[in-house]
Amino acid sequence: MHKAPSRTTITVRIQRRRKELTLSTHSYSRCWLHLVWETLRREPMLDKRAAARASVKLAEYSQEKGIYMKINYFNAEHTHALIDLPTNLTIEQVMQLLKGSSSHWINQSHLVKGRFAWGKGYGAFSVSQSDVSKVANYIATQEEHHRKRSFAQEYEIFVSRYGLEWRNEENR
C-alpha cells in the first residue's frame, strides 16, 4: 500500500477573499495488475538459465523504481508479472520501464545470441485483492500450464475472460 505524507494546510486567495483549506494528502492505492508481454515475433529466445537471471534482475529493478512486484515469470517467449501499480506511474510508464530495462539488461549481459527485443504491446489485466494469491499461483505454475497449451492458446483464453477481442498478430 502506498501512503503519502501527512496532512498539509494550504492558503489560497480567491477573488480577494482569503480561504484556508485543509487537504488530506493521504493517498491510498491498491491496484493489482497481471502484466503479460512477449518477445518479438514470439520467438523463443531465452533458455532457462537466461530466463532465471532476467527474472531476478526484473524484480530488483522493479524494487529500485518503487514498483511492488509480487512475482514474475520469464518463459522463452513471454513474461508474466503481478504488480501493485504505484500512484506515481501509469500502466504505460511501468511497461516502458519493465520492458525497456529488461531488454537492455538481457542484451548487455549477452544472455542470448544476437539482439533481444520484446514485441510491441502488452496485456495489463486488473486483479481483485481476493484473487491475488490465485494469480500469483497461476504465474508460479506457468511451466505446468504450457505443457497443456501454447502461449497463444493461453493468451486467447485469458483475453476473452476480460471481454476483449483477441487479435493473433504473429509478426509484430
Model feature map: region roles:
Residues 2-172:
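Basic nucleic-acid-binding interfaces
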